[in-house]
Every structure is written in structure tokens, then in C-alpha cells.
Amino acid sequence: MPPQKIETGHSDTIHDVVMDYYGKRVATASSDCTIKITGVSNSGGSQHLATLTGHRGPVWQVAWAHPKFGSLLASCSYDGQIILWKEGNQNQWTQAHVFTDHKVSVNSIAWAPHELGLSLACGASDGNISVFSARADGGWDTTKIDQAHPVGVTSVSWAPATEPGALVSSGMIDPVYKLASGGCDSTVKVWKFSNGSWKMDCFPALNKHTDWVRDVAWAPNLGLPKSTIASGSEDGKVIIWTIGKEGEQWEGTVLKDFKTPVWRVSWSLTGNLLAVSDGNNNVTVWKESVDGEWEQVTVVEP
């Protein structure tokens, strides 16, 4: 698909842009307190489909659920609300559920791999992470990581449901149930859910950054022999964290010092390309070479 400009119609800063599973629709979150859904096509055209209103503050992030759960979108905001939006008739969206467990800004949300069921992780400025999991009766169970990052959680990202090295995600008896998080304490942490509660799964915390961690992204690992997490920070650095087997230590390598805050890091579906957006309005794409060094493969022109 060639690069194309999308007119969203937002009246203030856009904080998040997420494409749906099929690549047909884009959801955007803005400081104008709204979410907009825009249809996109390979021919380069775009069409406004819906505006979702209900937040009372800037909307920081949006996240599409896997289509096996229907047409479902989550959003989080400075107002402390996490709203689940469900599409009934085409482009007719309603609020299916509103979570108000956090009384402060909710900064990041992420749906779990679909193999784990319908579960949403949320990180907030109160330092806590909440995970909401849908029950068969339509209700929701909540598990919490209290004071995950005491000064505030900035980002959450789920591990793939498959163990590193697996070539297929078929009939897993014991799927991986882990989260990575970043915070204002400059650390990245890994959490594992077992026996009904979340426990830290990295000792000590991953602490090569010297300022707020702005984003963490756990890489897809199908067929890859290791687990990989990318983190981007206010300190300008992107760090690639890797671990081989369970029980080993995470190792961090600086991909690059961008000399300006790094806002977002995002993996390709195959886990071999990493996109980085920085404070100079640049988006660069990186790939690991055979010798383990990271090299820039392209710049996405604005």
C-alpha cells in the first residue's frame, strides 16, 4: 500500500493511530476527547465512518480486539475511564462497558493474545496495572498489579501466547501469560500470571534507561528462539531486551540514541522489523543483521 494521507477531522493533537485486523479501518485517539474511525483503501482513498464521544479528557490510546470477539474497540483517557465500544449495525458504535477502577489518567491499554481470551491490560498514573478478563456470563474479572511503577505506568504490552521457538500456535496446553510494562521510574518490568495473581518475572527490573520509559513492545516470536522486548524512552534511547530460556537473565542492547525523546516502538507481524517514532517527527524502521547489530532500513517520509 503506498503512503497515504488520512484526514481524520480531529480538532486537536492525535495521540494514537491503530489499524484494525484487516487493514480496512483506522481508529485515532485525540486530545479533542474523541475517537474517530476512518475507512481506508488500497487505492488511497479514506472515508470518515464514525466519531465516538464519551471521554471527558484527552484520549491517549485505542486498541482493536481480535475479530473473533466481534467488532470491539477499547480506549483509555486522562479522565480515568476505559471504554469498550461495540459496533452493532455497520458504523453504529455504542459503549458496551466502562471501567472506572482507576481514578487518574489511564495511559496505556493492550488486548491480550486472542488465545488467552478477551483480556485487556491497562496502565495508569496511580502506578497500578489492571487486567480485565471477560467471563462467559458477560461479566468481567479483574486482577491487579499494585504499584507496578510507583510514579506511574506509561505503557503495557503482552507477550505472545506461544513459547519462543514454537512454529505454530496450535492447541497449546499452557499458553504464555506475561506482560511487559514501562514507567516513570525509568524501568521496564516483566510480569507473569500464575495461580491467580501477577508476580514480577524479572529480577532486578530492567533499568538501562535514565528517564521515563515512553513505550514498551513485546515482539512476535513465531519460530524465533528468544523473547524480545523493545523499549523507548524520554532519554532518547531505544533498548532491545532479549532472553533465551525461562530462568535466564534479560540482556539489554542499545539500538540507538536518537538524542530526542522516543515516543513509540512497534514491531512488524513477523517480529523482525521495528518502527521507532521520535521527537523530531521521524519514523525509522530497523532490522537486526546477521551479526546481531541493528541497522536502519528505511525512513518513513511524513
Curated annotation (Swiss-Prot):
Keyword Transport attached: yes
Coiled coil regions, renumbered to chain: none
Top-level taxonomic group: Eukaryota
Pfam families registered for this protein in UniProt: WD40
Gene Ontology biological-process entries: protein transport; vesicle-mediated transport
Major localization class: Golgi
Residues annotated as signal peptide: none
Subunit structure: Interacts with MAG5, SEC31A and SEC31B.
Family, per entry: Belongs to the WD repeat SEC13 family.
Name assigned to this protein: Protein transport protein SEC13 homolog A
Organism expressing this protein natively: Arabidopsis thaliana
Lineage: Eukaryota, Viridiplantae, Streptophyta, Embryophyta, Tracheophyta
Designated gene of the protein: SEC13A
